[in-house]
């Protein structure tokens, strides 16, 4: 279990089959010299940019519909984590955090300020987004089906194992949520079959910045349409002006 635990946490299956129209394919170099694949569509004048961190399964192609919707009102950048489609390296928490840092550095190189960047994290990507948001002052932090930590979920799932002693990648958003200065918007289905609703609600309570929690009636995990997300994100940002 200790040796193979990352095989249970990360599912980087599939190839990049679809690239959204007008998106650029780019390669990033991380601090540890790992090459990371990403998509980028520059923002139009006056638009903010969404920096997107996907969940633990699949790849960017499975989110292409969302990205196309977002691109009608925002610039969009989405990275393929190390170990996932077209990226080098092996999966790990610290590696993912470095991947996110490199994406932010790329946007800065395009003269995009942190306040003009909206971080979006889904599921395990929520922890990547929270980590980055705890270190810089962003325009907003949007999370879909987030959790307090992988440890919290693992303890419920593998209650018969000493997971607190053997878990390598903990993604402990609960320990750094208070450091986030950006406004926070959270979406979570009340009967989410994978990440318990209570996890998202508990994390929400730990943020000290302006925040909103949108509870959705349903038993799904990461299934909201791009239109639905964009509507609520845009409304929330308008209120925070």
Stretch-by-stretch model annotation:
Residues 227-241:
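Catalytic active-site module of serine/aspartate enzymes centered on a nucleophile-bearing elbow/loop
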Residues 191-195, 221-223:
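Acidic catalytic loop of the alpha/beta-hydrolase fold
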Residues 219-229:
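Catalytic histidine-centered segment of alpha/beta-hydrolase-like enzymes
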Residues 106-110, 116-159:
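Primarily recognizes the serine-hydrolase "nucleophile elbow" in alpha/beta-hydrolase
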Residues 1-29:
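An N-terminal hydrophobic leader/cap segment in hydrolases
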Residues 180-181, 186-188, 192:
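Short beta-strand/loop motif that positions the catalytic acidic residue
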Residues 66, 173, 182, 196-205:
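Short alpha-helix in the alpha/beta-hydrolase fold that links the catalytic acid
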Residues 31-106, 110, 115, 122, ...:
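Membrane-embedded segments
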């Amino acid at each position: 279990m200790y040796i193979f635990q990352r095989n249970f946490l990360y599912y980087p299956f599939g190839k990049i089959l679809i690239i959204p129209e007008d998106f650029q394919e780019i390669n990033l170099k991380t601090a540890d010299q790992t090459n990371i694949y990403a998509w980028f569509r520059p923002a139009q004048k006056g638009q903010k940019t969404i920096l997107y961190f996907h969940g633990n399964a699949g790849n960017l192609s499975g989110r292409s519909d969302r990205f196309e919707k977002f691109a009608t009102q925002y610039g969009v950048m989405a990275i393929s984590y190390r170990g996932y489609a077209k990226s080098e390296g092996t999966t790990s928490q610290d590696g993912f955090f470095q991947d996110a840092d490199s994406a932010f550095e790329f946007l800065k190189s395009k003269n995009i300020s942190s306040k003009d960047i909206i971080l979006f994290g889904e599921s395990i990507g929520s922890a990547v987004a929270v980590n980055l948001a705890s270190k810089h002052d962003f325009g907003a932090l949007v999370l879909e089906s987030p959790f307090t930590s992988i440890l919290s979920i693992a303890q419920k799932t593998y209650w018969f194992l000493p997971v607190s002693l053997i878990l390598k990648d903990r993604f402990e958003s609960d320990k750094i949520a208070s450091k986030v200065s950006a406004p926070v918007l959270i979406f979570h289905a009340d009967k989410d079959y994978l990440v318990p609703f209570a996890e998202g609600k508990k994390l929400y309570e730990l943020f000290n910045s302006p925040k909103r929690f949108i509870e959705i009636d349903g038993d799904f995990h990461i299934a909201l349409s791009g239109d639905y997300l964009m509507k609520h994100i845009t409304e929330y940002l308008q209120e925070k002006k």
